[in-house]
Amino acid sequence: MAKTLYEKLFDAHVVFEAPNETPLLYIDRHLVHEVTSPQAFDGLRAHHRPVRQPGKTFATMDHNVSTQTKDINASGEMARIQMQELIKNCNEFGVELYDLNHPYQGIVHVMGPEQGVTLPGMTIVCGDSHTATHGAFGALAFGIGTSEVEHVLATQTLKQGRAKTMKIEVTGNAAPGITAKDIVLAIIGKTGSAGGTGHVVEFCGDAIRALSMEGRMTLCNMAIEMGAKAGLVAPDETTFNYVKGRLHAPKGSDFDDAVEYWKTLKTDDGATFDTVVTLRAEEIAPQVTWGTNPGQVISVTDIIPDPASFSDPVERASAEKALAYMGLQPGVPLTDVAIDKVFIGSCTNSRIEDLRAAAEVAKGRKVAPGVQALVVPGSGPVKAQAEAEGLDKIFIEAGFEWRLPGCSMCLAMNNDRLNPGERCASTSNRNFEGRQGRGGRTHLVSPAMAAAAAVTGRFADIRSIK
């Protein structure tokens, strides 16, 4: 029987399945950070259980860390406690930890792929909703809750029901300046923020194949923002070339053998999906969100929509509420909207390719008066590579702040945040109310679009920035 990639990955990891019961899956990799793990380790301790597979468990500090100093106290008392608990728990249970002083420290969904912890064909979980990022490698990766974190630590397994399947095909070739972030925002604009609910999404088509691994990670990272359980891209030569030689990747003949298996990880001809969505890449323009969920998104050349234009009463009410929170008026061109802050970073867009794209725009320009612009590399290795390429100097000369690795302004859990009423062009993944700080107004954009907003002081079409 012909199978989708998701069905192959799921079936290959079923440990036990009884009639009328939820299947039990084996978990190949468990990624851990400081926010969702303390109670899970406490549960192990209370029941005198060890971590079953410490060699398949990797921890880092990211959500709470300051990006201005490596002082564990800088982000407040709760952050300090969570980071100290992670140190204690990893030491006690034998889990490898990339702490603030480790050269590999960084955002968990940046660290995993760059260290070769993430490999095609794996099941990967983390107590973090954007674990879908790792699906870019043809791995079944999804976020879990703290009780499930404890279950995986104790058993290396997880009960998981089968999801529906969705195929999202992006045909043709994207125009110059159009990035994976624009593509995925356009997809969510079409499906809505709940369009993928109950599904695992496989992204395919010529425009997807043309993306780098960094671009594919951006794509899968935001699968959750359309309500999907996970996102997938079938592995290919781009994947294999990225993985080869990384710290935890197979070596020598083992790598060659692995590639032969990884080549089978694709949807069979004749396999059927529950839902199919198609977009044409050449029709996608630079995207900017205007509301308070990622599905409220338009082209940078469009005007703010009028809630009255929505036929669905729920969408209309949502648009009215979003515009009131965002302080926007219908009919105003996006390019007339001024910004206060710019954030380039997050598990969506903090990799070297993202920083290069932003630096290309920033080079020879200056951050607009009154705008604060942050560039936060996703990990120690990304920061080191960017500095070796001189990107830090480009940003600093242009007036951007060059920071230490961390989740930073993606979420208000550290000392990088918006003040009430401040408007931010952000390369992160969520524009919910208060996401970047109480009363903060978030617009999601690509790294190049964020840099363009920084130097012009408002949203600008990257295609017109020469």
UniProtKB/Swiss-Prot annotation:
* Enzyme Commission code: 4.2.1.33
- What processes in GO biological process is this protein linked to? L-leucine biosynthetic process
Q: Which cofactor does it need?
A: [4Fe-4S] cluster
Where is [4Fe-4S] cluster bound in this sequence?
C347, C407, C410
Q: Which reaction does it catalyse?
A: (2R,3S)-3-isopropylmalate = (2S)-2-isopropylmalate
- Comment on bound cofactor: Binds 1 [4Fe-4S] cluster per subunit.
The record, for PROSITE patterns, names: ACONITASE_1, ACONITASE_2
Q: What Gene3D superfamilies does UniProt report for this protein, alphabetically?
A: Aconitase, domain 3 (3.30.499.10)
Q: In which pathway does it act?
A: Amino-acid biosynthesis; L-leucine biosynthesis; L-leucine from 3-methyl-2-oxobutanoate: step 2/4
Residues in the signal sequence:
none
What GO MF annotations does this protein's record show? 3-isopropylmalate dehydratase activity; 4 iron, 4 sulfur cluster binding; metal ion binding
Q: Which InterPro entries match?
A: 3-IsopropMal_deHydase_lsu, Acnase/IPM_dHydase_lsu_aba_1/3, Acoase/IPM_deHydtase_lsu_aba, Aconitase_4Fe-4S_BS, Aconitase_4Fe-4S_dom, IPM_dehydratase_rel_enz, IPMI_cat
Question: Which Pfam family, an example, fits this chain?
Answer: Aconitase
Provide the alphabetized UniProt keywords: 4Fe-4S, Amino-acid biosynthesis, Branched-chain amino acid biosynthesis, Iron, Iron-sulfur, Leucine biosynthesis, Lyase, Metal-binding
Class in the EC hierarchy, top level: lyase
Which family does the UniProt entry place this protein in?
Answer: Belongs to the aconitase/IPM isomerase family. LeuC type 1 subfamily.
Q: What does this protein do?
A: Catalyzes the isomerization between 2-isopropylmalate and 3-isopropylmalate, via the formation of 2-isopropylmaleate.
Q: How does it assemble?
A: Heterodimer of LeuC and LeuD.
This chain's protein is named 3-isopropylmalate dehydratase large subunit
> What's the source species for this entry?
Salmonella arizonae (strain ATCC BAA-731 / CDC346-86 / RSK2980)
Please state the gene responsible for encoding this protein.
leuC
